[in-house]
């Protein structure tokens, strides 16, 4: 088993989320929230990953972490489960811009579900101590470090190896891990909204700040791409590509099938179009929907796209 074992994990996670549902949602959204939650939990259970969520939740509770003490990274913050467990303050059902659960959960199970979070230095120390004690009950098989500082654990693998990196390296996908990297909130606030896109556009709304964050931190999206499209008046800020969700939304807007839109968005996100070009079925789908040329050309320049939920979480937490 690659996830930590917790007896009756599926039931415990369902009960935990159900108890939080009516606290977090008003009556008019309860039905929608319950349907989304059931879909998310059904996939989490299919992955046999309920224990992963409980492991992280229990760890944060055990060390007395409050929402202000951590900020989760990546796509998992796009889930109602994350909102109910206070892993994010952003409600995926009502937030603007939108975030989509299929980017956090899909049916392919290509990698194990893992968690990465920025935490305060105090919470980092407490989590290190917590997992030292935890290892007497469960197998904390690998730890990872930067400059001697532990910032995460792998759980449930039979081999014991340590990983040394910079907190954002290519972590293995074949084992569950929980990364809790200590950050200085004040230093991060200073750098978070720096970059040419922020300087030129001077965003005022949350949505525009989210877009500029993506234009700054994704790769191959601003210079010789969105910058030119905006300068020439071809498209406005809201339409340029900064995240894979931007690709997904425009394709849906033009009537591309949702499943194909998802595949194309993920293909663009990884920079595969730039390296290998379009697949024939993708070209056919976009041409049939009259997707504009500027968009397909913009996609070919993308090296990597951040998930929108990641940018939203950072801006909501630190700005």
Q: Predicted segment positions?
A:
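Short coil/turn residues that cap or connect secondary-structure elements
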Residues: 25, 48-51, 214, 255
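Mg2+-dependent phosphoryl-transfer active-site scaffold
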Residues: 1-17, 59-62, 69-72, 76-319
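Helix-rich "cap/lid" substructures immediately adjacent to catalytic or cofactor-binding pockets
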Residues: 29-71
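N-terminal leader/propeptide and maturation segments of large enzyme subunits in energy/redox metabolism
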Residues: 1-41
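General structural signal for alpha-helix termini and helix-helix connectors
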Residues: 23-27, 46, 253, 270
């Amino acid at each position: 088993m690659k996830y930590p074992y917790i007896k009756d994990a599926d039931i415990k996670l369902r009960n935990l989320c159900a108890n939080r549902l009516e606290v977090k949602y008003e009556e008019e959204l309860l039905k929608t929230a319950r349907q989304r939650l059931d879909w998310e939990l059904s996939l989490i259970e299919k992955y046999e990953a309920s224990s992963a969520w409980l492991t992280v939740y229990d760890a944060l509770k055990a060390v007395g972490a409050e929402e202000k003490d951590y900020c989760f990274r990546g796509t998992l913050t796009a889930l109602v489960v994350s909102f109910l467990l206070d892993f994010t303050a952003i409600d995926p059902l009502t937030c603007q811009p939108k975030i989509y659960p299929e980017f956090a959960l899909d049916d392919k199970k290509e990698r194990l579900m893992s968690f990465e979070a920025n935490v305060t230095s105090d919470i980092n120390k407490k989590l290190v101590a917590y997992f030292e004690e935890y290892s007497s009950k469960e197998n904390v098989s690998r730890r990872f470090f930067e400059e001697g500082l532990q910032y995460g654990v792998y759980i449930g693998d039979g081999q014991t190896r340590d990983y040394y990196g910079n907190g954002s390296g290519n972590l293995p996908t074949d084992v569950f891990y929980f990364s809790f990297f200590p950050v200085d909130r004040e230093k991060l606030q200073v750098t978070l909204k720096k970059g040419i896109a922020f300087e030129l556009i001077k965003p005022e709304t949350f949505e525009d700040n989210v877009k500029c964050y993506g234009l700054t931190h994704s790769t191959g999206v601003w210079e010789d791409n969105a910058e030119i499209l905006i300068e020439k008046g071809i498209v406005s800020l809201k339409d340029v590509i900064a995240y894979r969700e931007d690709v997904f939304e425009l394709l849906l807007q033009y009537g591309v099938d949702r499943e194909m839109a998802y595949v194309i968005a993920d293909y663009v996100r990884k920079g595969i179009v730039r390296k290998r070009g379009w697949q024939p079925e993708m070209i056919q789908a976009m041409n049939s929907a009259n997707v504009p040329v500027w968009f397909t050309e913009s996609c070919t320049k993308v090296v990597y796209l951040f998930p929108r939920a990641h940018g939203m979480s950072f801006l909501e937490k630190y700005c």
